[in-house]
From Swiss-Prot:
Lineage: Bacteria, Bacillati, Bacillota, Bacilli, Lactobacillales
Transmembrane stretches, start-end: none
Record-level GO cellular component terms: cytoplasm
InterPro entries associated with the record: Chaperonin_GroES (IPR020818), Chaperonin_GroES_sf (IPR037124), Chaprnonin_Cpn10_CS (IPR018369), GroES-like_sf (IPR011032)
Protein family membership: Belongs to the GroES chaperonin family.
Keywords, ordered alphabetically: Chaperone, Cytoplasm
Subunit comment: Heptamer of 7 subunits arranged in a ring. Interacts with the chaperonin GroEL.
Alphabetized PROSITE patterns for the sequence: CHAPERONINS_CPN10
Matching NCBIfam families: PRK00364.1-4
Pfam families cross-referenced by the UniProt entry: Cpn10
UniProt-recorded name of the protein: Co-chaperonin GroES
Length: 94
């Protein structure tokens, strides 16, 4: 399993029509964003005075992420993307 560092997040992209709260996203919005599930998160980032700021997302969250963000990786037969937390636009609450 992949364990990201810092504020990076491992995502599994959902390959289906994107909906948010039951609403289907417009075609142009689907081209700019992807729906994904958080598989793993880094520990967070440290501030200048050394405090650790934990990620805002957790394993299992469904999120909306920028379509062209991140790095495509494989772990065995599974495909994932690794993104910085800054590229996650929203948590999808159901």
């Amino acid at each position: 399993m992949l364990k990201p560092l810092g504020d990076r997040v491992v995502l599994k992209i959902e390959e289906k029509e994107q909906t948010v709260g039951g609403f289907v996203l417009a075609g142009s919005a689907q081209e700019k964003t992807k729906t994904a599930q958080v598989v793993a998160t880094g520990q967070g980032v440290r501030t200048l005075n050394g405090d650790l700021v934990a990620p805002s997302v957790k394993t299992g969250d469904r999120v909306l992420v920028e379509a062209h963000a991140g790095l495509d990786v494989k772990d065995g037969d599974e495909k994932y993307i690794i993104v910085g937390e800054v590229n996650i636009l929203a948590i999808i609450e159901e």
